Amino acid sequence: MSIKHPIIVVTGSSGAGTTSVKRTFEQIFYREKVKAAFVEGDSFHRYDRYEMRELMAAEAAKGNKHFSHFSPETNRLDDLAQLFKDYGATGSGRFRHYVHDAGEAKLYNTEPGRFTDWEDLEQGTDILFYEGLHGAVVTDELNLAQHADLKIGVVPVINLEWIQKIHRDKATRGYTTEDVTDTIMRRMPDYVRYICPQFTETDINFQRVPTVDTSNPFVARWIPTPDESMVVIRFRDPHGIDFPYLLSMIHNSFMSRANSIVIPGNKQDLAMQLLLTPLIMKLMDRKRRAG
């Protein structure tokens, strides 16, 4: 954690919706004139798309059916921890990009599925923003959660998460439902060991809960819409949270526990704006006072 160079992480599984949350942060940063450095968790994978395919096939041939990107072994978490440590101390650090598609390939002049070269973060940023799988992971060797000043978990109920992943991967990556199902099953042990425990470390969790039947996510024809959902917002430490204000500002919201508020799904962006803006500005105020 750092007063002069704060770090925000948004962590969630593949298909959880962390990219949408990132867009909300971008809106807040733009409105409040906060200059952020953005880092994606994909860029800290240990292997590129083609290396990973070969390794998965080799591991499967050995009988390992659970070789996945969710594991610390397939990610450069030591480099991510070093980035967090360096940024907290100096406001800089080394990062790279992972090139997802043809559009990014043109932007970074790198083949899709590959990494760009390592480079230094731009000087003079106010905040480091990380979005990915491992922002709050804690293992016997590493504690990434300790470096972040604000940790956000994006955690749809698991059937909804799977529906979102299946539809996204089919639409953008050309996968079949069977392909995505195999991926989900392969990742499950690492999901339980390394993804779920992070949501105990996060300061705020946003959990979307559908109000329609998602009993069999592998045959769902549509992703439940925000109007067909509620969102449970859970605070690790509810002290200082103005719940009466939130209840008055978000129509049809209610408290389900002393540290949790439930809102209509179509109010999630508004809730994030109301909740996160003061927290970000508090970090910026601390930064300014520290000189």
UniProtKB/Swiss-Prot annotation:
It catalyses: D-ribulose 5-phosphate + ATP = D-ribulose 1,5-bisphosphate + ADP + H(+). The keyword Transmembrane helix does not apply. The keyword ATP-binding applies. ATP binds at residues 12-20. Coiled coil: none annotated. Its EC number is 2.7.1.19. Keywords: ATP-binding, Calvin cycle, Kinase, Nucleotide-binding, Transferase. SUPFAM superfamilies: P-loop containing nucleoside triphosphate hydrolases. InterPro entries: P-loop_NTPase (IPR027417), PRK (IPR006082), PRK/URK (IPR006083). GO terms for molecular function: ATP binding; phosphoribulokinase activity. GO terms for biological process: reductive pentose-phosphate cycle. Pathway: Carbohydrate biosynthesis; Calvin cycle. It comes from the Bacteria. Transmembrane segments: none annotated. Homooctamer. Belongs to the phosphoribulokinase family. This is Phosphoribulokinase. The gene is cbbP.
